[in-house]
Structures are given as structure tokens and as C-alpha cells.
């Protein structure tokens, strides 16, 4: 039973990637999985439900990668930098390899928000842990780690669409590093700033 369900999810993932979630039908999926439509509908009531499971599969892979970054033994500031790079790396590989998810990220924000609820909860929890550790060690100057983490995630999301549209891996990496520097050190060059003169 579980094997059959996993097989359907894998086949659907491949088909959605190949011909898009909008064009693939339940009939196409049944044929590609070499099973009857009846068997397919025993496991999934609709294509929309199957799509949810396909994305859930991707979400689990994302959560594992983010968890690894959060669990690293680096100091809090370096851990946060690693985490941010991992976040955007995951978005890049997810949208680069999956046209159907890329389309949703770019044009269907409501569905993306629905699909990302679980990732968001996980991310806020992981980020809060990193920020709290940094605050306790005196590395980060923040009042409320959880609120700061929620705002940080909103900032990430505001950058994602431009990041996906650019689609240039090297340029995107440079942009993310610039944002990390901006967040960590600000935009002011203290040596030349008038704020520090008189």
C-alpha cells in the first residue's frame, strides 16, 4: 500500500516536471505508473490532492536541509549566514528543477502560501533557535528572537521572486551575499559617514 502510494508520487513528480501540473491528467499518471485509474483513485481523490503530496515530499527534503544548517556547530553568526545561503539554495534548486513549482512561486502566491505553511512554521522555529543562541552569547542585538525571525522570513520571501526570475545561479549567489552583508553590517561605511562626525 505504502509502496504503491510512493510510486504514484514519484511518477506524478516526474510528469509534473515534464509536462506541468496543469497539463498532466490523472489518466496520464495512471498510464505512466502502469496501473488502473481505479487503483490511482483509491490512493488519491484528485490531481490537486496528489499535487499536495508531491509538494509535501519536496517540503520534507527542504526541511531536512534547513535542519542540517540549523544544527551545525558553527558560532551563531556564521550559522545564520549558512542558514540564509541554504534557504536560497533550496529555493533555487526547487524552482530550477520543477517548472510546476516555479510557476506557482511566480504567479500563484495564494497557493504557494498554502503549500508553504509547514515550511514557514519550521523555518521560524529554526531561525528563532539560531537568533536566541546569538542573543544569549551577546552576538546579536535583538529584543525578541521570535519576532525578529518572523520579520527575517518576510524579508527572505520579498526577495524570492526576483531571485527566481533572474535564474542566474552565480549572480543570485552574489545578491544573497550582499543582502547578508547588509543585514549583518548595515549599508553605512562608518569611516566615511557623517553620522559619526560631530
PLM regions and their residue ranges:
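Short secondary-structure transition hinges
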Residues: 88-128, 136
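Short coil/turn segments at alpha/beta junctions that flank glycine-rich nucleotide-binding fingerprints
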Residues: 18-22, 73, 94, 137
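Secondary-structure edge/capping motif, primarily at the C-terminal ends of alpha-helices
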Residues: 69, 98-105, 163-166
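Hydrophobic alpha-helical connector segments
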Residues: 53, 67-93, 149-152
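Short, basic, alpha-helical segments at the C-terminal edge of helix-turn-helix-like DNA-binding modules
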Residues: 56-63
Amino acid at each position: 500500500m505504502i509502496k504503491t502510494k510512493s510510486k504514484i508520487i514519484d511518477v506524478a513528480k516526474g510528469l509534473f516536471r515534464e509536462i506541468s501540473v496543469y497539463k498532466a491528467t490523472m489518466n496520464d499518471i495512471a498510464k505512466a505508473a502502469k496501473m488502473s485509474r481505479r487503483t490511482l483513485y483509491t490512493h488519491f481523490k484528485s490531481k490537486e490532492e496528489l499535487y499536495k503530496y508531491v509538494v509535501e515530499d519536496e517540503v520534507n527534503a527542504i526541511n531536512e536541509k534547513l535542519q542540517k544548517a540549523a544544527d551545525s556547530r558553527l558560532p551563531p553568526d556564521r550559522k545564520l549566514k549558512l542558514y540564509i545561503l541554504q534557504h536560497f539554495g533550496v529555493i533555487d534548486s526547487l524552482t530550477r528543477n520543477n517548472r510546476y513549482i516555479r510557476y506557482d512561486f511566480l504567479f500563484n502566491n495564494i497557493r504557494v502560501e498554502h503549500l508553504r505553511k509547514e515550511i514557514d512554521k519550521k523555518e521560524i522555529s529554526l531561525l528563532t533557535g539560531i537568533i536566541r543562541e546569538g542573543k544569549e552569547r551577546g552576538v546579536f542585538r535583538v529584543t525578541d528572537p521570535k519576532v525578529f525571525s518572523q520579520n527575517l522570513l518576510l524579508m527572505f520571501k520579498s526577495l524570492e521572486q526576483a531571485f527566481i526570475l533572474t535564474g542566474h545561479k552565480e549572480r543570485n549567489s552574489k545578491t544573497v551575499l550582499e543582502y547578508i552583508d547588509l543585514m549583518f553590517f548595515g549599508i553605512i561605511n562608518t569611516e566615511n559617514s557623517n553620522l559619526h562626525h560631530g
